[in-house]
Amino acid sequence: MNVYVRELSREIGARGLAVDIFTRSQDPSRQRVRNLWPNVRVIHVPAGPEEPYDKHLVFNHLPQFTIGLREFAAAEGASYDLVHSHYWLSGWVARELAREWRLPTVHMFHTLGKMKNAVAQSEQERAPSERIRVEGELMRDMDRVVAATPLDRGQMVDLYGIDPKKIRIIPLGVDLDLFRPIPRDKAVAAIGVDIPSQHHLVLFVGRLDPLKGLETLFQALCRLRRSEPRLAEKMCLAVIGGDADRDSVRLSDDLECLDKLKQDMDVTDLVVFLGSRAQNTLPYYYSAAEVCVVPSHYESFGLVALEAMACGTPVIASRVGGLQLTVEDGVTGFLVPAGDADALAEKLKLILLGADLRKQLAANARRRAQAYTWQSVADHVIDLYEELWQQAL
């Protein structure tokens, strides 16, 4: 979501529209107002502890955030023409201020609580009740809602009863200048991970969240170790993950769970955990990998798959959500049933042992990704803004 907000704001600002991005302050020493690009600035508003914080507790501080945003706008003499919010927490704030300022609203959920609950495997994975309630209210109250895919749109209509006329389908984009194929030897040297040239690097990029399906990927590695021991000897899974917004205690718990999974499935020696990585370094990791795996149980779109494809890296993804539309099965990679470790292991074997197949999938992946640009996303979003402004005349 951070990538989406950043890249969309940059493109909108480049077209001459002024954009203020309001976010919760997580560091009291950080500059409160920072100019990102021409016409785009980010404002850090204190609300709750000024540190990485459990997102499930942020809801309690939304009134404070709303007051802080209102006070900033008043002090600056700022006036706005539209409020565009992302995720249900920001949507709550946007609705309150838009009512007060009588402004049109656009909202993007990115993920849906009811969809998360549909695939949750434990009570801890379920969305809180206030999220479900607020999402329903936002479906009703927002002027327009952006869906990333037709599947996303259908879920909103079926699960929340939103008026389908409110929804506009606008896919995500990828920075094709940043995410580009890099020669593998150069990429491997740049990332600094000790991988022998003849070894196969498998890549996972994502939050350390059960919904992301890492357990299924570990199970697939375990299957390959039994069925293809010679392949397993020359295979390494690099895990890039960790949420900067997650508090240190919960992140530590995630890492402990990850280590236990590796041990239980006897794949500790096949997995290296790299932690979080800066966005501008990810193309080197994607390009160093022979395949990127996105084994999620739920994805509204799946930006990681698109980034990997833009780097010419084949993708194996779960047949869920927007991944079904982004990844072309048998063309840019493979789709497998979510949670099916056997199917995932079989596709990993095909790609890792098939150099010619890998080469063809890689070429197709890059071509496919070129259809998704942030310039196109911004064009469609600005068209939506113009539609609302015309209605307000």
Region roles according to the model:
Residues 276, 284-289:
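Short alpha-helical donor nucleotide-sugar binding micro-motif in glycosyltransferases
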Residues 329-330, 334-341, 350-355:
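Conserved acidic donor-binding segment of nucleotide-sugar-dependent glycosyltransferases
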